[in-house]
Regions:
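Glycine-rich beta-strand-turn "strand-cap" elements at beta-sheet edges
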Residues: 1-24, 61-71, 96-122
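A broadly tuned preference for mixed-charge, low-complexity surface segments
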Residues: 78-91, 95, 114-122
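Short amphipathic alpha-helical segments
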Residues: 34-59, 92-100
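Intrinsic-disorder/low-complexity regions
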Residues: 7-9, 27, 35, 46, ...
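Short, well-ordered beta-strand segments in beta-rich or mixed alpha/beta enzyme
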Residues: 23-31, 61-90
Length: 122
């Protein structure tokens, strides 16, 4: 199971799951040992396949940092916090977490789009 390290110590993912919003974006930063990279990619693919079949899932994309160290960023869009919460707390998904390499550290955080005048829309 990956160690969970919050991006925001004062407002970790467990607290964010209690806020109703939508759509939401999950940003999950992963770090791990280089030798665990193949195992990480295999289990992430299985997890993403599971999430893709859940109600409220819109899309996901995995990114790898440039350079030698395996640092990954997962960006997933969900219709709502409640849809993500239901998928994340699903016992079948929770059981899969044990398969992650011991070196894996995950930093999940939920975001919502905002509008900035003349730049982007929410």
């Amino acid at each position: 199971m990956p160690l969970l390290r919050p991006l925001d110590l004062d407002f970790p993912i467990a607290r964010q799951l209690g806020i109703e919003a939508g759509p939401v974006v999950l940003v999950n930063l992963f770090t791990l040992a280089k030798e665990d990279e193949p195992a990480f990619l295999k289990i992430w693919q299985e997890d993403a396949g599971f999430m893709k079949r859940q109600p409220g899932f819109i899309s996901t994309q995995l990114h790898r940092a440039l350079g030698e160290n395996p640092t990954y960023l997962n960006y997933a869009v969900w219709e709502s916090t409640s849809a993500f919460r239901a998928a994340f707390s699903n016992p079948a998904f929770q059981a899969k977490l044990a398969a992650y390499p011991a070196s894996a550290v995950a930093s999940p955080h939920l975001f919502e789009k905002i509008a900035v005048a003349n730049i982007c829309v929410a």
